[in-house]
Amino acid sequence: MAAALLLYLPLLPGLAGAFNLDAENVIGRRGEPGSLFGFSLAMHRQLQPQEKRLLLVGAPREKAFPSQQANRTGGLYSCDITSSDTRCTRVVFDEDTDPKMESKEDQWMGVTVQSQGPGGNVVTCAHRYEKRQYVNTVQETRDIIGRCYVLSQDLTIKDDMDNGVWSFCDGRLRGHEKFGSCQQGVAATFTRDYHYIVFGAPGTYNWKGVVRAEQKNQTFYDLGIFDDGPYEVGDESRQDKNLVPVPANSYLGFSLDSGKGIVSQDEMTFVSGAPRANHSGAVVLLKKEKNQRALSLEHMFEGEGLASSFGYDVAVVDLNSDGWQDIVVGAPQYFDRSGDIGGAVYIYINQRGKWEGIKPIRLNGTADSMFGLAVENVGDINQDGYPDIAVGAPYDGFGKVYIYHGSKNGINTEPAQILDGEKTGTNFFGYSIAGNMDLDKNSYPDIAVGSLSDSVSVFRSRPVISITKSITVQPDKLDLKKKNPEDPSEIWMDVKACFQYTANPRNLNPRIKINYTFEAENERRQLGLPSRVRFKDYLSDQFTASTTLIGQNSKRCVTAKLVLQEKIKDKLRPIPIAVSVNIAGLESGSSSTRKERALPDLIPILNSNESETKITKVEFLKEGCGEDNECHSNLKLQYRFCTREGNEDRFTYLPIENGIPVLVLKDQKDIALEITVTNNPSDARNPQKDGEDAYEAKLIATFPDSLTYSAFREMRGYPEKQLTCGANQNGSQAECELGNPFKRNSNVTFYLILSTTKVNVDTTDLDINLKLETTSTQVNSTAITASAKVVLELLLSLTGVAKPSQVYFGGNIVGESAMKSEDNIGNLIEYEFRVTNLGRPLKTFGTASLDIQWPKEISNGKWLLYLMKIESKGLEKVSCQPQNEINVLHVAESHNSRRKREIAEKQLTDSKTFSLFSERKYKTLDCKVNAQCVDIRCPLKGFDSKASILLRSRLWNSTFLEEFSKMNYLDILVRASISVPAAAKNVKLTNEAAQVRVTVFPAKPVALYTGVPWWIIAVAIFAGVLMLALLVFLLWKCGFFKRSKKDHYDATYHKAEIHAQPSDKERLTSDA
């Protein structure tokens, strides 16, 4: 079949809201337990011998009459709901039994019941009625042929030929292949023209099923018309199963309805469901064949879901009132793979008798609800001109009945009302439904709902009325300069509202008490804004009172005084005044359509298609605006970013790069945004075009997460300063009121001071949304974005120190495997790097890191500095990476490092006494030249102003003995720097790298002094003394020690002094 339009009920909000079926004053009737009282229902109007409006209830498991020679046979009950007697009366018929010919045990009388209409007949059936032959013999046979009874309008069997038993399968060929299991009466109905009675027999022809229509109108006989039927699927004369348009086990005739205007406006069409046809179900449209006694196929609708029982129930109803009957089909066992759908109803909207290619509307029920087990034309229950339908879902909780209203488009797919069995305490509520008749005589059709719990509920329809509302205000325009002459301190308005109602039918004229509510400024109140007016007698902007409407089209008017509040801001937008109504009840003594009523009148309900509220608006006479009383403003905005010097109100514009302001943020706490707003005419040659007063003019500034509002400074304003600014709780938005009104040719310049404390390393831009708003007409009110680029300048310093700065090596060479304690490695060296922040707290920029180039090995891979441990001061617990470079050999820590360092320093001091005579050899060990280094990164978590990283290390003694024993000393360089993640984008880092130098000396000059014999020293001393003696002797021989005359002495002295240069002593000293 064609794909269906879907509607899933649980997705619709507010479906439980009631419309005009009264769910509070439900009329209930109960039957005998276990009787299935309420299995079938029909409303019947008796005209003779007296008028009665009855509810007929089938109870197919009711106990038998004594004369029926059975336990349970089923029965039919008549209920007068207008009576104070809550008991229903059992209809007496089918009392006798011939046990030799039949069995009525469990025949299920009352399985179906239908009324022909006002003054018409009633049909009820027992589809399990058994026809017997050869009782108490071995040839005994039992055929479940079923049969029906037709009763006259007063529920009795007349002697007329059309009353009594109707059993067309009786006397035909037996066996399930023919008519032996035809089960006539599973469904039965009358055509609406009173001409035919229609029976369904789904067990005929191996449960193919047949539909039979027989003439049922006394008028035909009076007119001499005797040859109108009967008509039957398979042909009543030929009884040919091959003419049945569905396969075996289809159950054709399981549900029935009929009507004209289905295929043709003049011809009757019979509609029947076959819920097991082709394993999914089908609905067939049947027509009478001329000159034959056959019903033949006109069209077939096929179910779309396997085992969905499509056609379990059908209803013919003109939903859109276009004169063509539409078709409603129930498929209570439809489901989908998701498991969310439990039953469906298909709505086929008639296209002027054309059914090919029609796409049905599918209404879906909730899971396991059996939605669509019963579908019923319940008439126009709200009297809107479109018939309505009811859908039963007996397994939806306690059971529910969904009411859908017809409309000009076919059907409103949202239920107008849901009746719930839980409220009546009824299980399996909605198994059967009857309607389309007014039981309580208020001109609105009512609904009866049956169940499998031996109970029936009747829901009466409340009259639907439409109340016309009008509201006027004097004066209709407010002049703020014109005060009330009675009280010059106030401005008054007179409000008048009038009401009248209409209803269907036109003769329905109850006296209705209504509650009316005057309400002003509802939208402002919902926004949390104060109202600009109040009602004088109630000191509030709303009040409720009551009045009475005495009948249809009778007008009733009420008045109230409205007072304008003082010092209002909004002087441009109109003041809305609304009046709404609801029905409070009926006044005592209210007349109805009938003078005497056994049931109390129901309170009418307002038409749901009409608004309960009527609104009018009062305009202001506006100053500074054009002759059209409309204000056309021309607000313009300019902005510039500034820095603020300290806490003083001195502002400096930011530098511009590529057209974008650049904010270099060091230690500033605030920045400022200079804003200028003007309201000048856009065209000086046509100043009346715009630039008029801007009422409630304001600027709304929305800041990014990195900025918060701090304050504002108004620098200048023309013609007067009237600026006020305020912010929301977290400072993310500021609102500045420019003036009310911000007059023509006004301008204002002010600064928004913004805190930068939330600016962090991820902040690359500042985008501030600026929007001008006014209640005047502003042609261009688009928001603009003020943008600036952010550069963060970090003022960080880094210093480093090593303790001690000079160490020694010496002793014996020890292998790596022998290192058990750090003392075995070598002397202790502790490095400390101090980081100081001179600018903004670093926490706002994220996490900085200290990067250290650690000289781990010399160029040939031998150990240089062994890193034992890393600690911190002024930080959270430090975790440097890579962790596997710390104490790689897992040697034990030593706690005597201080003493060993002091001994080392003393030995180093002693060893320096020999350096005078050493050859001065030295070397620098540097990561950039001859050392293999590891990059160690230490995050400075929690760092704010000061922090220190301490590295505890050991000089690898054996490496220095092996590689550097001939060196007088060596320098080891360790470098460190600071980095910040994402610094390349917007962070300017001004720190300098730190370099720490440690000098290493050998413990003693091993290669210079080891192995010198003692005798060499003695010979050297003797040679020195001998040479000194020889020198003295030579001087004596030369007369050096004699006294001479002065002139000779002077010459001799000079000569001797010349010969003594250079002296032996000086030469020896030089050689040494």
Swiss-Prot record:
A lipid is attached at C1038 (S-palmitoyl cysteine). Residues 1-18 form the signal peptide. It comes from the Eukaryota. One of its GO terms (biological process) is leukocyte migration. It is found in: Cell membrane. FG-GAP repeats lie at residues 23-88, 94-160, 170-223, 238-295, 296-357, 358-413, 414-476. The modification Phosphoserine is found at S1070. A motif (GFFKR motif) lies at residues 1039-1043. The keyword Isomerase does not apply. Ca(2+) 3 binds at D438, D440, N442, Y444, D446. PROSITE patterns: FG_GAP, INTEGRIN_ALPHA. Heterodimer of an alpha and a beta subunit. The alpha subunit is composed of a heavy and a light chain linked by a disulfide bond. Alpha-6 associates with either beta-1 (ITGB1) or beta-4 (ITGB4) to form ITGA6:ITGB1 and ITGA6:ITGB4, respectively. PANTHER family: INTEGRIN ALPHA (PTHR23220), INTEGRIN ALPHA-6 (PTHR23220:SF9). This is Integrin alpha-6. It comes from Gallus gallus (Chicken).
